[in-house]
Amino acid sequence: MRIRPATAEDFETIVCHRIAMFRDMGYPAAVLTDIEEVSRPILHHSLANGGYYGVLAESDGASVVGGGGVLVVAWPGTQPQRAWIQNVYVVPEFRRRGIAREIVRTLIDWCRARGFHSVNLHASTDGRPLYEQLGFEATNEMRLAL
């Protein structure tokens, strides 16, 4: 298995992984459609302008079996930008092999090399143990559905 940077040519794979991730978390089909419609232009633009750094995991046969990325957003705080890990996904038949861990470590290293003081993410129930093992901590972020 190898981890490689994603390119603009990997756009469809990134979108497919994002939708599969939410499907695995139990989101209904109608919500998945909305997520895809909103995600496509944002990811396309962010991939093109460098606001999204993605990586893909390839099996020994060179098929893509997982991926993840960092979305860099403007943020008024101690740093002018904030890094958000997103779209961490591994196809079911390749899970429990440390692939997600390597994807996330690669993304953390990328953030560290660019001078970010922290990196954020929203963890799924299944992903939370991995992120805690890597040192992520729960924060006091809150949300109000409108």
Predicted ranges, named:
Residues 2-16:
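A short beta-loop-alpha structural element at the N-terminal edge
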Residues 44-56, 84:
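A short helix-loop-beta-strand connector motif used in the catalytic cores of GNAT acetyltransferases and
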Residues 56, 63-72, 84, 89:
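Conserved beta-strand in the GNAT
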Residues 73-85, 95:
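A conserved beta-turn-beta hairpin within the catalytic core of GNAT-like acetyltransferases
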Residues 75-78, 120-126, 132, 137-146:
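Conserved catalytic-core motifs of GNAT/GCN5-like acyltransferases
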Residues 111-123:
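Conserved GNAT acetyl-CoA-binding A-motif
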